[in-house]
């Protein structure tokens, strides 16, 4: 039986990681030359 705390931490990390990736991709799409790249 999976502990609720462990599963919560894993889900939290996944959500934060996906959110960070989408946010970075969105920034690069909106402003491709903002960071010189």
Curated annotation (Swiss-Prot):
Gene Ontology terms: biological process: cytochrome complex assembly; photosynthesis
SUPFAM superfamilies: PetG subunit of the cytochrome b6f complex (SSF103446)
InterPro entries: Cyt_6/f_cplx_su5 (IPR003683), Cyt_6/f_cplx_su5_sf (IPR036099)
UniProt GO cellular component terms: cytochrome b6f complex; plasma membrane-derived thylakoid membrane
This protein's name: Cytochrome b6-f complex subunit 5
Signal peptide residues on this chain, from the entry's feature table: none
Entry function: Component of the cytochrome b6-f complex, which mediates electron transfer between photosystem II (PSII) and photosystem I (PSI), cyclic electron flow around PSI, and state transitions. PetG is required for either the stability or assembly of the cytochrome b6-f complex.
Membrane topology summary: Single-pass membrane protein
Main localization, broad class: membrane
Record's keyword terms, sorted: Electron transport, Membrane, Photosynthesis, Thylakoid, Transmembrane, Transmembrane helix, Transport
Gene responsible for this protein: petG
Location in the cell: Cellular thylakoid membrane
Pfam families linked: PetG (PF02529)
TM spans (from-to): 5-25
Single GO term (MF): electron transporter, transferring electrons within cytochrome b6/f complex of photosystem II activity
HAMAP family the UniProt entry points to: Cytb6_f_PetG
